From Swiss-Prot:
GO CC list: acetyl-CoA carboxylase complex; chloroplast stroma
Subcellular location: Plastid, Chloroplast stroma
Binding site residues for Zn(2+): C225, C228, C244, C247
Protein name: Acetyl-coenzyme A carboxylase carboxyl transferase subunit beta, chloroplastic
Superkingdom in the source lineage: Eukaryota
Pathway assigned in UniProt: Lipid metabolism; malonyl-CoA biosynthesis; malonyl-CoA from acetyl-CoA: step 1/1
Gene Ontology terms: biological process: fatty acid biosynthetic process; malonyl-CoA biosynthetic process
Job of this protein: Component of the acetyl coenzyme A carboxylase (ACC) complex. Biotin carboxylase (BC) catalyzes the carboxylation of biotin on its carrier protein (BCCP) and then the CO(2) group is transferred by the transcarboxylase to acetyl-CoA to form malonyl-CoA.
Source species of the chain: Solanum bulbocastanum (Wild potato)
Length: 490
């Protein structure tokens, strides 16, 4: 039977110290000093990183079972806790005799000659114990549900607590190690250590070689949110449509995932998959030739270019759809991207199909010079014939980011323009504007919510509703599912 201890982190806003028992170290002491209100998280005491020894009582765990853990709330109520994973048992005991014996041990320590020699008021160990026994606000019982919810994170030893005003998710040592592969090696010992300073107090986090192996082993399982810097389990993220489960932020999606989201299974028929760029102006940079860069992105993404085009069905309604992929050279629009989108529009016009283009681009591709710029006019010309002459229906979907030549051409030509929540939409980026005009661009002035208020587009639709909204729009414009259309003709 394997039992795990839970490291209690019980806080209040004006709290000056948070404390707990650190089982794998065999010592008692404050976990970290802070005056803020972090979230309660769970930690695997047997294998996670630990702070330095902070208490001098080496035999304290003689009084505590190897499989139990002690916490105390502000009211003086103490609890002995253990969690049995195999049998799915979570127990909280209030054993007064056990607690009395433990407190008696500390009492003897406090009354020892060491404390009586004038160190009692200045002894950090004594203050740590007093803070631990009496200075926590919330009962452990109020947070058991939070512990269970965060059990998954505890299995790979990620400390996800947020220290407001100090470290954020992005600044967290362990978060950086998971997300960026920050090296933890040190030549001093078998493990490694890093000392930080939070609110005037030193904190040393120790990493063993095993911890480094765990960090590297599980790094590929997580995706970090761009907004809150929280970690999302990659296996579940796709089923959640790449929406952060912690803050609801819409993360970037690949073109293949978007096609899977919008198009009915088994109905996708791609077009012009074999079309590739030939470096028309022989663009060469000091870093990497253009052809080599194209090849590397093709290997990385599995795509031939920054857009996928094809025919499929959306809730049974035949549609022509083009989906740009920001992972391929920032979704930049070169001659191949422009040609594929133009051919898609012409095919939709010939087949009388509604058209969807999902935009995710940094603009025209500079490696192709004026050839990339002329794609704006070519696509706009094809859309003119599709919309005005054929009287067909085009929906433009703007995702983050949509900038440059795409914004200045087909991105803003939709009969209905839809944006995703929090999407970054602009012609020139913030940095370009500030460097050109020498003016500061207000924060959020290029976000979808702000631009919607200015009338730049028609709808802001979250991903989980997008397919149904598109289906209703098509029906409103007399595009029906194939089975309904045939029955109406009869």
């Amino acid at each position: 039977m394997e039992r795990w201890g839970f490291n209690s982190m019980l806080f209040k806003k004006e709290f000056e110290r948070r404390c707990g028992l650190n089982k794998s170290m065999g010592s008692l002491g404050p976990i970290e000093n802070t005056s803020e209100d972090p979230n309660l998280k769970v930690k695997n005491i047997h294998s996670c990183s630990n702070v330095d020894y902070l208490f001098g009582v080496k035999d304290i765990w003689n009084f505590i079972s190897d499989d139990t853990f002690l916490v105390s709330d502000r009211n003086g109520d103490s609890y002995s806790i253990y969690f049995d994973i195999e049998n799915q048992i979570f127990e909280v005991d209030n054993d007064h005799s056990f607690l009395s014996e433990l407190e008696s041990s500390f009492s003897s320590y406090r009354n020892s000659s060491y404390l009586n020699n004038g160190f009692r008021g200045e002894d950090p160990y004594y203050n740590s114990y007093m803070s631990y026994m009496y200075d926590t606000q919330y009962s452990w019982n109020n947070h058991i549900n939070s512990c269970i919810d965060n059990y998954l994170q505890s299995q790979i030893c990620i400390d996800t607590s947020i220290i407001s005003g100090g470290e954020s998710y992005g600044d967290s040592y362990i978060y950086r190690a998971i997300c960026s592969g920050e090296s933890l090696n040190s030549s001093e010992n078998e493990g490694s250590s890093r000392r930080t300073r939070t609110k005037g107090s030193d904190l040393t986090i120790r990493e063993s070689s095993n911890d480094l192996e765990v960090t590297q082993k599980y790094k590929h399982l997580w995706v970090q949110c761009e907004n809150c810097y929280g970690l999302n389990y990659k296996k579940f993220l796709k089923s959640k449509m790449n929406i952060c489960e912690q803050c609801g932020y819409h993360l970037k999606m690949s073109s293949s995932d978007r096609i899977e989201l919008l198009i009915d299974p088994g109905t996708w028929d791609p077009m012009d998959e074999d079309m590739v760029s030939l470096d028309p102006i022989e663009f060469h940079s000091e870093e990497e030739p253009y052809k080599d860069r194209i090849d590397s992105y093709q290997r990385k993404t599995g795509l031939t270019e920054a857009v996928q085009t094809g025919i499929g069905q959306l809730n049974g309604i035949p549609v022509a759809i083009g989906v740009m992929d920001f992972q391929f050279m920032g979704g930049s629009m070169g001659s191949v991207v422009g040609e594929k989108i133009t051919r898609l529009i012409e095919h939709a016009a010939n087949q009388n199909l509604p058209l969807i283009i999902v935009c995710a681009s940094g603009g025209a591709r500079m490696q192709e010079g004026s050839l990339s710029l002329m794609q704006m006019a070519k696509i706009s010309s094809a859309l003119y014939d599709y919309q005005l002459n054929k009287k067909l229906f085009y929906v433009s979907i703007l995702t983050s980011p949509t900038t440059g030549g795409v914004t200045a051409s087909f991105g803003m030509l939709g009969d209905i323009i839809i944006a995703e929540p929090n999407a970054y939409i602009a012609f020139a980026g913030k940095r370009v504007i500030e460097q050109t005009l020498n003016k500061t661009v207000p924060e959020g002035s290029q976000a979808a919510e702000y631009l919607f208020q200015k009338g730049l587009f028609d709808l802001i639709v979250p991903r989980n509703l997008l397919k149904s909204v598109l289906s209703e729009l098509f029906k409103l414009h007399a595009f029906f599912p194939l089975n309904q259309k045939s029955s109406k003709i009869k």
